[in-house]
């Protein structure tokens, strides 16, 4: 693998923050910020696909977001539904596979059906995987993985002493995908907000002051360039990493 290819993250995860503040700054209702954020999603997908990123995970709706005003939650659900129906064909035409992770049980049946339809419609995509986290929380993900393993133990298919970090990781919602190499958060906040808690253990973190609707092509390329200039050590010394790169 050439050096430039090594500098490209296989998996990028993004916390899309700042939609409401973007709208408030313009004296617009909060949902206007979320609608504007769809354009940023398209831009980031384009940059990731052209750069060689294999997986992009977007934090669209957290399990804590249900605590927001009912009117805002309702508007977000309508936006999610319309975006799924509108964008599925675009993703299919661009050979992009859509996956949705999270607890779907709380969503309206119509939205759950739209999720399944969009995933089926784009299932043949081979260029790129777009993973959307909806009603997702990192703690929920670890708990559901533990429950899956507990059922295997209860059924006699697995011994407790055989449970390893690798086995638990495989039971996470993202289990069959590479771990995120880079996690980006927009909006100026410096926290991960219960997003991919297990998976981000060794991810590089990148924080942008831009609100999500303003985070487009140039901003995404800047984040990827920053990643390319970092040295990922995974517990090793700089000297060890440099020696391995030369060998």
Where do the language-model regions lie?
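Flexible, compositionally biased loop and terminal segments
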Residues: 1-247
